[in-house]
Each structure stands twice: as structure tokens, then as C-alpha cells.
């Protein structure tokens, strides 16, 4: 087995998947990375297969998807696997980010890993939006029209940029072609960023752990211990995903998208996929178009400032009760935003959306630094009392 350590390619695999020393107290919350990698592989394989039968033209896109569903051998399975794994991908990413926020994975020396992860999240959202347009149902067309129109909020040149993106004066053949090309290419860019994410993690301090202390005191090799641990959650994931694919494949979709796109008829409500709803709610809660767009993008990118705003001395919230409370309030608020994004723009949803948006941004900009300062002060007071 000496070749595993001497061969230039095998030694890389060995360093990352076999001999990689991991803290011995990792919980199952550290399994999301392998699950997300598994999702990306599924998406690339099923996506390339679907692309072999898809026709990116306004007149044939919807029919080609129907052809995949009805005529291609197991085409229904490939398509449902692709669409449901996309939802699973985002669900797991949100859990992965939530775990990172709770356990302080953004703190030095893992700041670069956190930053690359945020870029991956933004690129995932862009890729998902492009893919949602491709079946060219009603929600595809009108979703594409609404979201690309956000670029018109850019002063002076906005409308020109929108028409440049469309390749015409509305969503047309050129739009569908370029969206298909980008949707095909971006997952491979995503895979490259995932490798960078891994390299940044391994070349700094490796994985964190639930205690937030140095993991150097007790480590175990990745194989066989953590490979087996990852396989448990991968098999559980396959079971849950199979239940969705075989028993309720359309539960996370929108019924409007099973109607061929009609530019002359607007759907009753234009709603994106569930995983983009919190940011859609933030966009709609601000009356000004430009400020709404800025707020929506800021809501995604704001997690990058966590290494600066978290002034706590310990990594993670395990031993910080006040921060724990604020974290769970933040999670509840995020779920409220998700629900509000699916509702019509009317009272009281507008007011609730504005309150939730203020709470969302104040969590990162005001609550986190303030609560961490209070906790630091309480610790100092306790230490002074014990010394005296």
C-alpha cells in the first residue's frame, strides 16, 4: 500500500480521505459536507443525462421535458432525482451553514473556508434559478421575467443590462439558450469551488469540533471511522430522497410549472422555489426597488461579516447561553421569512416581512456583537469575583 503515499494523485486522496486526522468527538452535524458532495455528484450526473434529451428553445423546451418524462427510458426517474435532489441540496446547505454559525466555524483560522462557502452558496442560488427557468412552464417564464427585471433597478444602465441578459426585449429563445449553457457550466465551477473549500479547510486547522477547543489532543484517521459514519447518513439520505422521488415527487414544486409558458397570461402569484423564499420575502418587504435588490443580496452575503461581528472569546455557542437564545430566535425568524415569501403581498404580511427583515439584519450587525460583549463582561466579572 506504499503507492497510496508515494504516488502524486493517490497521496492527495490518502491525505483527504484515508489518513486525514479528524477530532475524535465530531458529531453527526459534521456529516453535511459528505452529503453535500454526494448531492453535487447526483446533480451533475443527472443534469448531464437530462441535457442529452433537452431542447433549449421557446417552442420545444416544455415538450422536450414532457418527452423526457414519457418516452425516455427512466426519464421520469432522472428528472425527479434532479429536481428533488436540488431541494435536498439547499436543505442540507442551510443546515451546514446553521451548524457553522452555531459552532463558530467562521472564526480564524477557518475564515477563508467560510468565505469560499458563502461564494458557493451564492453560485448555488444562481445555478438553481437558471435551472428553474429551463422547463419553460408558467412559473419558469414569469419567475425569469421578475428576477432578471431586478437588474433594471441599477441606475441609468439597468434596462440596458436586462435586455443584454435577455438577448432581446423579453424572455425569448436567446434567453433560454444562454440560461441552459450557464446552467450546464456552473455546476463544474461549483465543483472547483468545493475543492477550494476543502483545500482551505485542510490547509488551515482542519475540522472544528463540538467543544470549540483545539482538536489536536485526540484525533482519529478518516478511514475507516469517519467514512463509515458518513456512509450511515448517506444511506439515510438515500432512503428519505427515495420516499420523495417515488411517492411525492411534485410536493416541493409549483403546479403552475406544469402549464406551458404563456407570455399573455400572468400566474395568480409569482413564487420562486421554497429555498429562495426568505430572500424573496426580504426583497418584497422594502418598497424601493433598488434598496430591495441591495437588501436581498446583502442578506446572503452578510454571513461573511460574522468573523468580524462575533466578539466572543470562545468558538461556538455551546457555553454561551445568551448567544444560544439569539441564535434560535434567528432560526425561527428565518423560517418566518420563508413562510412570508410564499404569501401574497398584502397586509399583514408586508408588515411582518418588514419586522422580520429588520430582525434578520440586526442579528448580524447589532445583536451578535452586543450579546458577545455582554457575555465577555459577565465572564470577566465572575473571574474578578473568584480572584478577590
UniProtKB/Swiss-Prot annotation:
Residue spans crossing the bilayer: 32-52, 76-98, 113-133, 179-199, 226-246, 290-310, 322-342, 349-369
Binding site residues for a ubiquinone: 202
GO BP term, pick one: mitochondrial electron transport, ubiquinol to cytochrome c
Cofactor(s) needed: heme b
Keywords: Electron transport, Heme, Iron, Membrane, Metal-binding, Mitochondrion, Mitochondrion inner membrane, Respiratory chain, Transmembrane, Transmembrane helix, Transport, Ubiquinone
Protein family: Belongs to the cytochrome b family.
Misc note: Heme 1 (or BL or b562) is low-potential and absorbs at about 562 nm, and heme 2 (or BH or b566) is high-potential and absorbs at about 566 nm.
Full protein name: Cytochrome b
